[in-house]
């Protein structure tokens, strides 16, 4: 997809209408005296959409670098090489918003800044979406340095805002810089011609400029409501923060629907790759455990078996390191953008509306899906597996990026994953029906589940209690390596770089996502054992019958396993719904009762 940065549109339009550069504006336009004074400042904010339209200078985070077509960042246009996925700017272009904790860096030209005035000239608000219908009804919330929300520093020609509290995910924020910020000569900092065009009350010279100008006016009005003198504002920006956990929760919701209606009802159409019906039917099942000796201390017994888990990454040698998760549904952002785009053809709009109507999705659903969890739970399953082909034969949202607007991942394969199970010996009295409380253990980077066989950890955890410990390898670790022709099988247990994947950052991100989903779905498989035990089948289940279905499941994670556990605890315990049935399903199949996280990130 070709990304369109609004900043480039603005710069190109201004260039066509006779603007010179940041030092001059041709045509002798009428300029507001306040703007005119600001433009004469020796020290100005470094924001330039005019001088070089092919390489605009923008201040991030900003709405100017958002792609309205699919709701993602368009930062790859700012990268030297937009195809180089090791560049964070390119990777950010695959996400649905800006960081919740990354510092805001604002550069200036001219003189150095006066550090004593740094905190006086910066303001940050949590707001509604200025493009939404209900924006005016949402009062802005002011974040301050005094309340510990952020700290502002000035050094040289750079103003740095350090977020000491993370911003909310999938939320709207606006920041402003005012002339209360001074340079070392004691003079007010000023705006550039680029911002002057957006701030001016004179109508934009071309239609393409109007959205940015309208947003700037709305933003300055919002700061005025919050008590900031808009005549002092020399720059504003609005930005959306990235979602956190939406994709993983969508994966959990898809699993819940698969449990309820069958896996084939969820993983179908464009939401599934080359997966056979036989493999699909194995999802969330476990083979009976077989004896594999004892722990290193000889105290407890080790068993092994297979668990069948959904896998959303590629496994082929030529794809596993370069292909991130893909969405199994068309993007809601792409759908809404097309329907609201004045330049879109009536034929395409008719096609989309006809499809939505056929699938049972209303216009009200589209309006509320971003904010109403109940509507989300309705719409996402209806779109999963679907494809929209436009009048020219092209597919709407052919990129199928994973975002909060298209969070359901495409199933690439059903993985047969080896599990390890550690149980107390017969002499303990624990080898009886419904005796053992269940825990899941997850190892760290470069390690493997074999830690349960080669260390004293399981003996320490079990001690003298009736406790069962399950473990599987992280993706690409241990028994889950990748076979490379001419090389053999490689694993992250010896080559951690294949998991971290700094060459293709989105794949590194999704390796971690897959790690979390594996634990969620292992928990589901254990929950299915619990359900069978509760139905009175313990006698026929052999070793599995010894598990206690009434004590829930705990999680123990070390290093990368602890990092996985942070997300697992959040998503596994996030309710699927409010009904009694939803709560029962969460407790039986998903919830994690206790978390023990050692050295996350170490």
Feature-to-residue mapping (PLM):
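A catalytic-pocket lid/entrance helix-loop region that shapes and gates access to the active site
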Residues: 190-217, 491-499, 576-602
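Positively charged n-region of N-terminal signal peptides that target proteins for export
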Residues: 1-5
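Primarily recognizes the serine-hydrolase "nucleophile elbow" in alpha/beta-hydrolase
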Residues: 540-602
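Cap/lid segment of the alpha/beta-hydrolase catalytic domain
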Residues: 383-408, 430-529, 535
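A conserved hydrophobic secondary-structure block that centers on an alpha-helix together
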Residues: 153-184, 407, 411-455
């Amino acid at each position: 997809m070709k990304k369109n940065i609004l900043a480039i549109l603005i710069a190109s339009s201004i260039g066509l209408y006779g603007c010179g550069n940041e030092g001059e504006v041709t045509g002798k336009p009428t300029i507001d005296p306040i703007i005119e004074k600001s433009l004469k400042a020796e020290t100005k904010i470094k924001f330039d959409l005019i001088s070089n339209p092919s390489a605009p200078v923008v201040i991030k985070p900003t709405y100017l670098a958002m792609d309205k077509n699919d709701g993602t960042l368009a930062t790859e246009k700012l990268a030297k090489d937009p195809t180089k996925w090791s560049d964070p700017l390119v990777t950010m272009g695959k996400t649905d918003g800006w960081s919740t904790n990354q510092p805001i860096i604002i550069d200036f030209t001219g003189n150095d800044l006066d550090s004593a005035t740094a905190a006086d000239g910066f303001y940050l608000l949590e707001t509604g979406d200025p493009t939404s219908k209900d924006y005016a009804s949402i009062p802005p919330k002011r974040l301050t340095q005094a309340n510990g929300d952020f700290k502002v520093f000035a050094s040289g020609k750079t103003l740095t805002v350090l977020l000491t509290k993370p911003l909310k995910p999938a939320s709207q924020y606006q920041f402003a810089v005012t002339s209360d910020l001074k340079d070392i000569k004691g003079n007010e900092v000023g705006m550039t011609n680029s911002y002057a065009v957006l701030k001016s009350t004179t109508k934009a010279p071309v239609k393409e400029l109007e959205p940015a100008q309208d947003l700037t006016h709305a933003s300055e009005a919002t700061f005025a409501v919050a008590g900031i003198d808009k005549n002092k504002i020399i720059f504003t920006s609005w930005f959306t923060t990235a979602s956190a956990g939406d994709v993983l929760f969508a994966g959990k919701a898809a699993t819940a629907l698969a449990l309820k209606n069958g896996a084939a009802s969820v993983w179908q159409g464009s939401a599934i790759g080359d997966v056979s019906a036989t493999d699909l039917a194995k999802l969330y099942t476990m083979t009976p455990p077989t004896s594999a000796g004892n722990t290193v201390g000889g105290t407890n017994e080790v068993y092994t078996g297979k668990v069948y888990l959904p896998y959303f990454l590629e496994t082929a040698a030529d794809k596993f390191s370069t292909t991130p998760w893909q969405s199994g549904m068309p993007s809601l952002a792409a759908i809404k953008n097309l329907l609201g785009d004045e330049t879109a053809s009536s034929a395409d709009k008719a096609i989309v509306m006809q499809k939505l109507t056929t699938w049972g999705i209303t216009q009200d659903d589209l309006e509320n899906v971003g904010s109403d969890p109940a509507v989300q739970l309705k719409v996402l399953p209806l779109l999963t597996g679907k494809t929209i082909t436009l009048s020219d034969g092209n597919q709407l949202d052919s990129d199928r990026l994973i975002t909060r607007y298209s969070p359901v991942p495409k199933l690439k394969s059903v993985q047969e994953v080896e599990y390890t199970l550690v149980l107390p010996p017969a002499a303990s009295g624990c080898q009886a029906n419904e005796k053992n409380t269940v825990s899941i253990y997850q190892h760290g980077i470069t390690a493997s589940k074999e830690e349960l066989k080669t260390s004293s950890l399981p003996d320490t955890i079990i001690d003298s209690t009736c406790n069962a410990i399950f473990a599987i390898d992280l993706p690409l670790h241990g028994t889950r390596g990748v076979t490379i022709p001419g090389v053999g099988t490689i694993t992250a247990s010896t080559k951690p770089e294949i998991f971290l994947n700094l060459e293709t950052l989105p794949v590194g991100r999704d390796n971690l996502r897959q790690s979390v989903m594996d634990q969620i779905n292992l928990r589901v498989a254990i929950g299915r054992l619990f359900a069978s035990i509760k139905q009175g089948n313990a006698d026929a289940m052999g070793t599995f019958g010894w598990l206690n279905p009434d004590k829930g499941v705990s999680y123990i994670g070390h290093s990368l396993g602890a990092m996985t556990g942070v997300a697992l605890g959040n998503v596994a315990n996030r309710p699927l719904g409010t009904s009694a049935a939803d709560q029962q399903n969460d407790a039986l199949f998903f919830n994690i009762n206790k978390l023990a996280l050692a050295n996350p990130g170490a």
